[in-house]
Amino acid sequence: FHRHFCLATKHRTDGLTFANLAFPLVLPKTPDKTVGFEERGRPKMDGSGGYKGKAEGSNSSEGLWIANLTGEPLDKASEIVWFESAYDAMAEYQINPVKMVYVSTGGTPTEGQMRGLLSVTPNARHYLGFDKDDAGRQFVANFRKVAAEMGFRHEHVQAYHPLGCYKDWNDALLNK
């Protein structure tokens, strides 16, 4: 995944500097043009969660982090795996290292994100690795509705969760 993220640094006027992992957001129809960044900071000193968000000015309604590991153009993809975060996508790959197209919505999936990628990948199977909670189940239902409206067969859109009691793929990797 080394080609699919960078470090972003923010220098504030009060002299503080923050560095985050930044995952470029693109539009599926123009995957070479960055339209924002999904950002993740370091955990705090007390071990609690770090910063999670999007860079100012990001196109969050349509932009997706797309890590196409297949070597083929996006419109030729046969399998696409969706996640709520790039961390979950990379965690799933650590558990199941298969070269597919990995996608993060950077939070709650939007209809614009769904329609954008579905329109470019009409022959692909979509595996929905959203969190195993009420919100994640709703995201799967929303995705299936949009995909059906666009003519996708039900069996081409599948929920894809880690085995066991894990909430998400990162928790599965870390055995939390």
Give the location of each predicted region.
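TOPRIM fold recognition
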Residues: Q94-K176
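Phosphate-handling DNA/RNA-contact segment within nucleic-acid enzymes
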Residues: R12-P122
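Flexible, active-site-adjacent loop/turn segments at secondary-structure boundaries
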Residues: F5, V35, E62-L64, K167, ...
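Glycine-centered structural positions embedded in regular secondary structure
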Residues: H4-A8, G36, G136
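Short, basic/aromatic recognition patches
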Residues: F1-L16
